[in-house]
């Protein structure tokens, strides 16, 4: 999900404050390149590429509405001014998953935050989908989580099947308070969504306690997807779990939500995650 405050702050820092008086129709590609190269030369080549892409979108929007006539920025590529983010491939092993779950249970973090972190592990959701989740989004009797379009990355509502483990965790969380938001600030006593930084901070603390190769909350999502494949779950079902659009013609003609299949897949994954190491074969390297 796009964090608009972050985008606004980034554009304000690198574009509005230093270049806000410039007139777009007077700017050629060399002038644009100088702006982004300054960001890259300041030690942020990846951010230079991000700012370039954001500004391309801004200028295209202005072009469509005939507010500007010149679009020289479109001539630039990310590699002309900086570089693209490195593609992460981190997948946690089953031993690491077991260790992580154990660390969560033994941690001093509030129980509501423990549940938050466990649900990220067991559902493969985006953190923003969970931190902004409301009671009305869940039908726990049917093991279904409906993520509204406002919270999904592609802005389309989708249904996610839940395992029995996830349902039990959600019931526990909802029984802890009467607020509409499922995950609220522990000490606030207010019906507001928990801050988006909470899972990131918790993940960083847990990672430090674990040691070994670094990981992020998004790596837990990738781990879910990888293990679903390894467990024999059909690709289209695994993609539905993550809230991804199906590829190609399937996106047009296949509008089935595969909830029953998702629930079966997530129960299979939960069983794999919960089964003691000495009773299972590791299915991923």
Predicted feature locations:
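Catalytic-site neighborhood detector that most strongly recognizes the C-terminal catalytic loop/helix
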Residues: 83, 91, 147-155, 189, ...
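Basic/aromatic-enriched alpha-helical hairpins
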Residues: 1-42, 58-61
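Active-site/catalytic core of tyrosine-dependent DNA strand-transfer enzymes
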Residues: 91-98, 142, 151, 161-213, ...
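Basic, Lys/Arg- and aromatic-enriched nucleic-acid-binding interface segment
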Residues: 41-54, 64-127, 131-132, 141, ...
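C-terminal secondary-structure termini that scaffold catalytic or DNA-interacting sites
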Residues: 164, 168-179, 184-193, 248, ...
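Short, amphipathic alpha-helical segments that act as regulatory/interfacial helices
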Residues: 8-12, 52-63, 117-124, 229, ...
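Short, polar N-cap/turn motifs at the start of nucleic acid-interacting alpha helices
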Residues: 137-144, 212-214, 233-253, 276-285
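Short basic/aromatic active-site micro-motif
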Residues: 27, 112-114, 213-231
């Amino acid at each position: 999900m796009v964090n608009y405050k972050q985008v606004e702050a980034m554009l304000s820092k690198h574009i509005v404050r230093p270049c806000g008086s410039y007139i777009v129709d007077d700017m050629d590609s060399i002038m644009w390149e100088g702006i982004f190269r300054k960001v890259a030369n300041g030690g942020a080549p990846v951010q230079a590429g991000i700012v370039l892409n954001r500004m391309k979108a801004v200028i295209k929007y202005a072009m469509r509405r005939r507010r500007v006539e010149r679009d020289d920025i479109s001539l630039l590529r990310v590699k002309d001014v900086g570089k693209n983010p490195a593609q992460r491939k981190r997948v946690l092993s089953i031993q690491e998953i077991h260790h992580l779950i154990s660390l969560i249970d033994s941690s001093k973090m509030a129980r509501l935050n423990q549940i938050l972190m466990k649900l990220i592990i067991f559902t493969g959701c985006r953190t923003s989908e969970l931190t902004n989740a409301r009671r009305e989004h869940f039908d726990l009797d049917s093991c279904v989580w409906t993520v509204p379009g406002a919270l999904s990355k592609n802005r389309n509502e989708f249904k996610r099947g839940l395992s029995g483990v996830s349902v039990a965790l959600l019931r526990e969380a909802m029984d802890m308070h009467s607020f509409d938001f499922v995950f609220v600030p522990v000490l606030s006593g207010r019906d507001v969504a928990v801050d988006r930084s909470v899972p990131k901070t918790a993940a960083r603390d847990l990672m430090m306690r674990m040691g070994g190769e670094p990981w992020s909350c998004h790596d837990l999502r990738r781990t879910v997807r990888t293990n679903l494949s390894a467990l024999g779950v059909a690709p289209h079902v695994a993609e539905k779990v993550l809230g991804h659009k199906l590829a190609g013609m399937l996106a047009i003609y296949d509008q089935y939500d595969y909830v029953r299949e998702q629930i079966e897949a997530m129960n299979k994954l939960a069983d794999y995650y919960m089964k003691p190491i000495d009773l299972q074969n590791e299915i991923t390297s």
